[in-house]
From Swiss-Prot:
Binding positions (Ni(2+) 2): K488, H517, H543
Protein family membership: In the C-terminal section; belongs to the metallo-dependent hydrolases superfamily. Urease alpha subunit family.
Gene3D superfamilies in UniProt: Metal-dependent hydrolases, Urease, beta subunit, Urease, gamma-like subunit, Urease, subunit C, domain 1
Chain sites annotated for binding Ni(2+) 1: H405, H407, K488, D631
Enzyme nomenclature, EC number: 3.5.1.5
Function of the molecule: Urea hydrolase involved in nitrogen recycling from ureide, purine, and arginine catabolism.
Name the record gives this protein: Urease
Domain (Urease) ranges: 400-838
Entry's Gene Ontology cellular component terms: cytosol; urease activator complex; urease complex
Catalytic reactions of this protein: urea + 2 H2O + H(+) = hydrogencarbonate + 2 NH4(+)
Residues with N6-carboxylysine modification: K488
Cofactor note text: Binds 2 nickel ions per subunit.
Species: Arabidopsis thaliana (Mouse-ear cress)
Upper classification of the organism: Eukaryota, Viridiplantae, Streptophyta, Embryophyta, Tracheophyta
Length: 838
């Protein structure tokens, strides 16, 4: 067959398309992924038929599916489908614009060549319920005035050339085409008063008036045609006139030119509606946007960009030499990469800003650009010739997620994790051994070396926990000094009070965290005896509700203990109608139990309680459970840490209303609380919050970029240590990056030595002093965790509630401060069927 990579990938696309056809044929309304796959697949098949042109196929692509054949959200997710195929005259691009534009599609065309039965249109009834628009924006009041307060002038301009001239917003107007005739003296130090990144076009012979405004910043002109090179105030007009005459630049004094101030006089003022502004640069202060297809709206609290001086990259746009891109910027201040105009969602706030990255770290958050021509540019956020641009307009940026409960059962976990937005994995294991299937322990120094070496080139941060289940300290010291960044106590190894006490004593000695999965059997004592064994020392309790393991039925009481940092694992996030039913078999497999042994079954059943799972939802919403993690392949799903966090937040808003009654028109308080659960709080709990866990200056640039409509489900790009490590990318042979199949793929930041350069291995201070980096031949940066032994629940950002919790041992009813915690299971959740193929 001699298949090329692009052919193999299109076979995968065809499989997805044929699956979508089968679902359509049985009357199933298609989701986003299915609709794209079906349309792209059919276009390729029509190309193979060989009797239709590109233009004909662009039209046919709009006829295949109608609004009734897709889920309601798809209309607001799917705007374009592109695919390249081999026509009679070679490979060509077919772009289908607005592919869902009819009430009903032509199902015979949609199923052409599949030999599947064409379903009756009666199988696709109208949908009358309210439609959630993923990524929907709601705009604040008023309009946006750009370049407010700047001196302005209206000049008449004539194009005396024989070809059109198009002038961008930030082009120094005195430097424009020599055959444009206007008063260049009045244009000195001025540019067009139009939205950043737009342009004015002058056709041959055309005469029009334009409004110019002062350039911003230091008012320095460089580049262009080079007729001015320096401060505007230093220009000698006589010398400049001689230069223009010698070089043929036309100038005509405009004695009727009017002058004023932009924003004060309507003649000189340019206003943009908030909707148009948001479509061009992303939402601004007071605007709100929906997160995915949830019912959560984030309101922009502050916009650090400058209206009229936004950084926009592209042909004829702002970030060009001498305009938004400075010339001969100071090397120390010039960025490696800038993410422009992004909405940042972080525990610290929800705001709009440019993000500056240098040497793999965030060096600035605010206004980037060229201080010679733009207002408000921060000193360390200069855009120069060395600066790469990631367009963040209309996008959301979050910190990379931290999963701090990982069973390292298989290396494929890494790819599922990073493609979902996880950039740090903490846990233990050695592969699919039975110990690892049940517990997050890397038990021996030999295994610790293996795990640090095997992950050395992977583009994520890693930290491994040793086994903590022994009543004597020697072996614990060995594993900590071999590289363990923490210790794990697990009931499958015997989490007895003696082991707990010894493990915590060693942790105090080495300044590392202890993670605990307590004794479901109550064999050595009840939950209060385990809490007593802590003796006030800091400990991180895994799956604190108990379905994942722990004292039955009341381990959830630890969520009210000050020295306990409680977390959840995601199978119980949120509580839904199928949550309980799936858990028994899950538990039997993970913990090597035998369904033929009654005591094993009783052990499993004791851990699965609808009442405590329901209470877990509410405790998260109260901020009494601080962290959400996965429990990967061991009663947890590593690729759903983020989505299940937001599903929980969505469910709690629907059932409990606003967290802050005074801010009921947005969900910022809830959003910041929930994002802290998988970013800053696991970073604090594990002792590396000074390096990762939030979008803050000086931290490693571990960032996730999302389209708002896909937020929480499928990220657009993952940046690891300042490098693009993973991203949605189309056909590698295509003429542009967007034709199908678009797949979440590793990028250059994930290949070769890049993963070692852009990521970190976390170890103990003792291991760092012993030189494990050199002993193991590690290329990754090796960093010691620190400052975890004095932590309390009060250090958990926005999740520090300490309710007094009780659990009835017979009915399992949970109360917090005397209030019964109960909620109904959800019938459906967002971030699910609209997006995923399976």
């Amino acid at each position: 067959m001699k298949l090329l990579p692009r052919e193999i990938e299109k076979l995968e696309l065809h499989q997805a398309g044929f699956l979508a056809q089968k679902r359509l044929a049985r009357g199933i309304r298609l989701n986003y992924t299915e609709a794209v796959a079906l349309i792209a697949t059919q276009i390729l098949e029509f190309i193979r038929d060989g009797d239709k042109s590109v233009a004909e196929l662009m039209d046919i692509g709009r006829q295949l599916l109608g609004r009734r054949q897709v889920l309601p959200a798809v209309l607001h997710l799917l705007y374009t489908v592109q695919v390249e195929g081999t026509f009679r005259d070679g490979t060509k691009l077919v772009t289908v614009h607005e592919p869902i534009s009819l009430e009903n599609g032509n199902l015979e065309l949609a199923l052409h060549g599949s030999f599947l039965p064409v379903p009756s249109l009666d199988k696709f009834p109208e949908v009358h319920e309210g439609v959630i628009i993923p990524g929907d924006m709601k705009y604040g009041d008023g309009s946006i005035i750009i370049n407010h307060g700047r001196k302005a002038v209206v000049l008449k301009v004539v194009n005396t050339g024989d070809r059109p001239v198009q002038v961008g917003s930030h082009y120094h107007f005195i430097e424009v085409n020599p055959l444009l005739v206007f008063d260049r003296r009045k244009a000195l130090g001025m540019r067009l008063n139009i939205p950043a990144g737009t342009a004015v076009r002058f056709e041959p012979g055309e005469r029009k008036s334009v409004v110019l405004v002062n350039i911003g910043g230091n008012k320095v002109i460089r580049g262009g045609n080079g007729i001015v090179d320096g401060l505007v105030d230093d220009v000698n007009w006589t010398v400049l006139m001689e230069t223009m005459e010698r070089r043929g630049f036309k100038h005509l004094e405009d004695i009727d030119a009017s002058e004023g101030i932009a924003g004060e006089d309507p003649r000189f003022t340019t206003m943009i509606s908030r909707e148009k502004y948001a479509n061009m640069y992303g939402p601004t202060t007071g605007d709100k946007l929906r997160l995915g297809d949830t019912n959560l709206y984030a309101r922009i609290e502050k916009d650090y960009t400058v209206y009229g001086d936004e950084c926009v990259f592209g042909g004829g746009k702002v970030l060009r030499e001498g305009m938004g891109q400075g010339i001969e910027q100071a090397e120390a201040l010039s960025l490696d990469t800038v993410i422009t105009n992004s909405v940042i969602i972080d525990y610290s706030g929800i705001y709009k800003a440019d993000i500056g990255i240098k040497n793999g770290h965030i060096v600035g958050i605010g206004k980037a650009g060229n201080p010679d021509t733009m207002h408000g540019v921060q000193n360390n956020m200069l855009i120069g010739n060395k600066t790469e641009v990631i367009a963040g307009e209309g996008m959301i940026v979050t910190a990379g997620a931290i999963d701090c409960h990982v069973h390292f059962i298989c290396p494929q976990l890494v790819y599922e994790a990073v493609s979902s937005g996880i950039t740090t994995m903490v846990g233990g294991g050695t592969g699919p051994a039975y110990g690892t299937r049940a517990t997050t322990c890397t038990p021996s120094p030999f295994d610790m070396k293996l795990m640090l070496q095997s992950t050395d080139s992977l583009p994520l941060n890693f930290g491994f926990t040793g086994k903590g289940n022994t009543a004597k300290p020697l072996e614990l010291r060995h594993i900590v000094e071999a590289g363990a960044m923490g210790l794990k106590l697990h009931e499958d190894w015997g989490t007895t009070p003696a082991a707990i006490d010894n493990c915590l004593a060693v942790a105090e000695e080495y300044d590392i965290q202890v993670n605990i999965h307590t004794d479901t059997l109550n064999e050595s004592g009840f939950v209060e005896h385990t809490i007593n064994a802590f003796r006030g020392r800091t400990i991180h309790t895994y799956h604190s509700e108990g379905a994942g393991g722990g004292h039955a039925p009341d381990i959830i009481r630890v969520c009210g203990v000050k020295n306990v940092l409680p977390s959840s694992t995601n199978p119980t996030r949120p509580y839904t109608k199928n949550t309980v039913d799936e858990h028994l078999d899950m538990l039997m497999v993970c913990h090597h139990l035998d369904k033929n042994i009654p005591e094993d079954v009783a052990f499993a059943e004791s851990r699965i309680r609808a009442e405590t799972i329901a209470a877990e939802d509410i405790l998260h919403d109260m901020g009494a459970i601080s962290i959400i993690s996965s429990d990967s392949q061991a009663m947890g799903r590593i690729g759903e840490v983020i989505s299940r966090t937001w599903q929980t937040a969505d469910k709690m808003k629907a059932q409990r209303g606003a967290i802050d009654p005074n801010m009921a028109d947005d969900d910022n308080s809830r959003i910041k609380r929930y994002i802290a659960k998988y970013t800053i709080n696991p970073a604090i709990a594990n002792g590396f919050a000074d390096l990762i866990g939030s979008v803050e200056v000086k931290k490693l640039a571990d960032l996730v970029i999302w389209q708002p409509a896909f937020f929480g489900a499928k990220p657009e790009m993952i940046i690891k240590g300042g490098n693009i490590a993973w991203a949605n990318m189309g056909d590698a042979n295509a003429s542009i990056p967007t034709p199908e199949p678009v797949i979440s793929r590793p990028m250059f930041g994930a290949f070769g030595k890049a993963g070692s350069e852009n990521s970190v291995a976390f170890v103990s201070k003792a291991a760092l002093r012993k030189g494990v980096k050199e002993l193991y031949g590690l290329k990754k940066r090796v960093v010691a965790v620190s400052n975890v032994r004095q932590l309390t629940k009060l250090d958990m950002k926005l999740n520090d509630a300490l309710p007094e919790i009780t659990v009835d041992p017979e009915t399992y009813v949970v109360t917090a401060n005397g209030e019964v915690l109960t909620c109904a299971p959800a019938d459906s959740v967002p971030l699910s069927r609209n997006y995923f193929l399976f």
